[in-house]
Amino acid sequence: MKPIYGLIGNPVAHSMSPDIHNAALKDLSLEGHYHAFRVENEDLEDAVKGMRALGIQGFNVTVPHKVSIMKHLDRIDESAEALGAVNTVRREKEGLVGYNTDGAGFLKSLKPSLDRPLSELSILLIGAGGAARAIFTTLAAETPKRLDVANRTPEKALAFTQRFDGEARALSLQEAEADLSAYDIVIQTTSVGMHPNVEAAPLSLANAKETCLVCDIIYNPLKTALLHEAEAKGLKTLDGVGMFIGQAALAFELWTGHEPNMEKMKSIVLQQLGGKSC
């Protein structure tokens, strides 16, 4: 049987993971097929059992399962354990093993947009889910000047900031919005603004300073409501395409042992979205 790869999450109808992974398999003349599976929270355990039964070689994990998937796996890679979330699963001799390529993928996309080292910058991270965990831990290793986390429930954000040795605060979204002028970088990691709820934004950028870089890890739509507001204010922006491609390429290599052509992956995404990346 040809190898099967996949994606589990909810929603997944918008995902371009099947497009880029299937194109990469074809480009490298590798057998296999990648398919997206919509999985509700209450069905996650059964879905993982199904992955085992079907002999699926590897799969990506997206919202809302990046944290809850961990208890259903046979082993968690050390880096994913430290990040507290899994976005990639590979079938190995010992069973299903969880990895995380989110943090490395995001950092790879962020650095070309910076004119100073992260150690000189104050950062606001919006959200406290699986992707936020990965990005927070990766950024913390870069020792930024300040690394605050804002979330609808500040208690969840507090669990992040307590792990950082430097200056960090856990904030409500309202508190972050009021103090937005303190940040050089704002990073939006939640599903707010994702297709089909494209008019939504987690907070207003009214108080952001002129030099602020606004990042949104969502890539569909290419420009979220938050990024549209940032552009209208003349702020620099970074969409989620770079992170999406970066983490996908790392996952693909984990499964197949082959490095995909990232430029081809990016061109597929931009063609599907009908625009140019920020």
From Swiss-Prot:
One matching Pfam family: SDH_C
Binding-site list for shikimate: 15-17, 62, 87, 102, 219
SUPFAM superfamilies (alphabetical): Aminoacid dehydrogenase-like, N-terminal domain, NAD(P)-binding Rossmann-fold domains
EC number, UniProt record: 1.1.1.25
Catalytic activity reported: shikimate + NADP(+) = 3-dehydroshikimate + NADPH + H(+)
Cellular component terms (Gene Ontology): cytosol
Keywords of this entry: Amino-acid biosynthesis, Aromatic amino acid biosynthesis, NADP, Oxidoreductase
Major enzyme class: oxidoreductase
Signal peptide per UniProt: none
GO biological process: amino acid biosynthetic process; aromatic amino acid family biosynthetic process; chorismate biosynthetic process; shikimate metabolic process
PANTHER family assigned: BIFUNCTIONAL 3-DEHYDROQUINATE DEHYDRATASE_SHIKIMATE DEHYDROGENASE, CHLOROPLASTIC (PTHR21089:SF1), SHIKIMATE DEHYDROGENASE (PTHR21089)
Protein task: Involved in the biosynthesis of the chorismate, which leads to the biosynthesis of aromatic amino acids. Catalyzes the reversible NADPH linked reduction of 3-dehydroshikimate (DHSA) to yield shikimate (SA).
Listed name of the protein: Shikimate dehydrogenase (NADP(+))
Organism: Bacillus licheniformis (strain ATCC 14580 / DSM 13 / JCM 2505 / CCUG 7422 / NBRC 12200 / NCIMB 9375 / NCTC 10341 / NRRL NRS-1264 / Gibson 46)
Gene name of the record: aroE
